[in-house]
């Protein structure tokens, strides 16, 4: 998605450890117009997948997931990282390691929000090593739902997450695919297709 790539080049910042900081429009301050465009693009990409529900992990996956849900007219469920006093129902849980925060979290979803006949689209802000997606796969497996696909805002194709999804035979659509960082320069897969 060219608009997203341009925004990454304009406002993103490469940090040590191959971390891309995009807090100016995605995961701290949110640009609603860009989010709407991303949600619309996800809806277009998965229009024939029979999606009945969207699943994400709090918190940075919520905005793109909600915009996709709005465009697709389906509910959005987000896995909570911290158990609240209101989260008392039977739960599906999984452990997820955060690449950027270097911590593990238990994510939880109330069982009543995932039914065996659901076709679930997983959406997240980043795909690096695939730990958040792996946690969502685990929850979907426990709920016996069909995974319609995975939608990622920004994918680092040089890390292991892509292969993790491919090994499951699940369709993956990423709006921006980063092939490498060169100092503070970001290189996209779309550059290779334009050459």
From Swiss-Prot:
Its EC number is 2.4.2.22. It catalyses: XMP + diphosphate = xanthine + 5-phospho-alpha-D-ribose 1-diphosphate. GO terms for cellular component: cytoplasm. It is an enzyme of class 2 (transferase). It comes from Lactiplantibacillus plantarum (strain ATCC BAA-793 / NCIMB 8826 / WCFS1) (Lactobacillus plantarum). It is found in: Cytoplasm. InterPro entries: PRibTrfase_dom (IPR000836), PRTase-like (IPR029057), Pur/Pyrimidine_PRTase (IPR050118), Xanthine_PRibTrfase (IPR010079). One of its GO terms (molecular function) is xanthine phosphoribosyltransferase activity. This is Xanthine phosphoribosyltransferase. The lineage of its organism: Bacteria, Bacillati, Bacillota, Bacilli, Lactobacillales. Pathway: Purine metabolism; XMP biosynthesis via salvage pathway; XMP from xanthine: step 1/1. Belongs to the purine/pyrimidine phosphoribosyltransferase family. Xpt subfamily. Homodimer. Converts the preformed base xanthine, a product of nucleic acid breakdown, to xanthosine 5'-monophosphate (XMP), so it can be reused for RNA or DNA synthesis. Xanthine binds at residues 20, 27, 156. Keywords: Cytoplasm, Glycosyltransferase, Purine salvage, Transferase. 5-phospho-alpha-D-ribose 1-diphosphate binds at residues 128-132. One of its GO terms (biological process) is XMP salvage.
């Amino acid at each position: 998605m060219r608009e997203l790539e341009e925004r990454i080049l304009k406002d993103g910042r490469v940090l040590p450890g191959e971390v891309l900081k995009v807090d100016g429009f995605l995961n701290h301050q949110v640009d609603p117009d860009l989010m709407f465009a991303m949600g619309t693009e996800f809806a277009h990409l998965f229009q024939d997948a029979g999606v009945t529900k969207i699943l994400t992990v709090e918190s940075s996956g919520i905005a793109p997931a909600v915009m996709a849900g709005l465009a697709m007219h389906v509910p959005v469920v987000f896995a909570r990282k911290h158990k609240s006093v209101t989260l008392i129902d039977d739960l599906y849980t999984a452990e997820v390691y955060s690449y950027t925060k270097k911590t593990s979290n238990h994510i939880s979803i109330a069982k009543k929000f995932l039914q065996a006949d659901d076709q679930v689209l997983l959406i997240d802000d980043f795909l690096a090593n695939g730990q958040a997606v792996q946690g969502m796969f685990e929850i979907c497996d426990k709920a016996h739902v069909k995974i319609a696909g995975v939608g990622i805002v920004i994918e680092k194709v040089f890390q292991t997450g892509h292969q993790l999804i491919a090994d499951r035979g699940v369709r993956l659509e990423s709006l921006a695919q980063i092939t490498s960082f060169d100092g503070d320069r970001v290189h996209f897969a779309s550059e290779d297709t334009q050459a």
